[in-house]
A protein has these predicted regions:
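Conserved phosphate/oxyanion-binding catalytic-loop motifs
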Residues: 44
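Asp-based, Mg2+/Mn2+-dependent phosphohydrolase catalytic module
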Residues: 2-8, 15-33, 47-50, 54-70, ...
């Protein structure tokens, strides 16, 4: 069948850290040329959708509407709004995460927040972990924006948000609710955004543990491109095979898939 819509990862798929992936750029340009609906679904919480839009245009030659960018931050806010608890929160994360949550009407509370939200934080320290630990012990709802233990960069694999969240889970003995890929919370909303049936969509990404499992675990066909996290030599040993595997997105045939 020919897919009618695409859910696409960013880091490791369309670009890698600060480095361009020309095949990723060409892939998006072809989607735009063919007027095929797509949504960038990213676990990155360090940037707002507007910041992601600007980065794609300025650094990677991809002009895309902000409405085509769905981050784990937006999915986290949607989830918190659906829960409907008091709008107080303690956030470990970068400005992109904090500002978006505050813009949604949530107020920081370090003592007795209704939520503790943890994403990637380049300046994380012991005191932040201590504050979050005490709040969770008091009953704060523990949310992890995404489970990525590592993130691919031009320097190599670095600790991701999942590494920080795992530390807090160990300290509190409380399991977090994870929002980002591969979890259903973000994928259900992403599918809703496209307005298509799941079998009409393909999830495109470089990380088997997040992107591809997001497809497999949620009934969506998957396309693994081995330009980032998951390496070609690992494909044969994957527990459940992706629907499609490519070494480069230039190999993708839009007319046959």
């Amino acid at each position: 069948m020919t897919y009618k819509g695409y859910l696409i990862d960013l880091d490791g798929t369309i670009y890698k850290g600060k480095d361009r992936i020309p095949a990723g750029e060409a892939f998006v340009h072809e989607l735009q040329k063919r007027d095929i609906p797509y949504l960038f679904v990213t676990n990155n919480t360090t940037r707002t959708p507007e910041s992601v839009q600007e980065m794609l245009a300025n650094q990677f030659n991809i002009d895309t509407p902000v409405s085509t960018i769905y981050t784990a931050t937006l999915a986290t806010i949607d989830y918190m709004n659906d829960l409907g608890l008091e709008k107080t929160v303690y956030v470990i994360g970068e400005a992109g995460l904090k500002e978006a949550i505050q813009a949604a009407g949530y107020v920081e509370d370090k003592e007795n927040p209704a939520y503790v939200v943890v994403g990637l934080d380049w300046q994380v320290d012991y005191e932040k972990f201590a504050t979050a630990t005490l709040a969770i012990h008091k009953g704060a709802y523990f949310i992890g924006t995404n489970p990525d233990l590592n993130i691919p960069t031009e320097r190599g694999l670095l600790p991701g948000a999942g590494s920080l969240i795992t530390l807090l889970e160990a300290a509190t003995r409380v399991k977090p609710v994870y929002i980002g890929k591969p979890n259903a919370i973000i994928m259900d909303k992403a599918v809703e955004h496209l307005g298509l049936e799941r079998q009409e969509i393909v999830m495109v990404g470089d990380n088997y543990l997040t992107d591809i499992r997001a497809g497999i675990d949620n009934g969506i066909p998957s396309l693994l491109v081995t330009t980032g996290f998951t390496k070609p030599e690992e494909v044969a040993d994957l527990p459940i095979a992706p629907t499609h595997v490519l070494s480069s997105l230039t190999e993708w045939n839009f007319d046959e898939n």
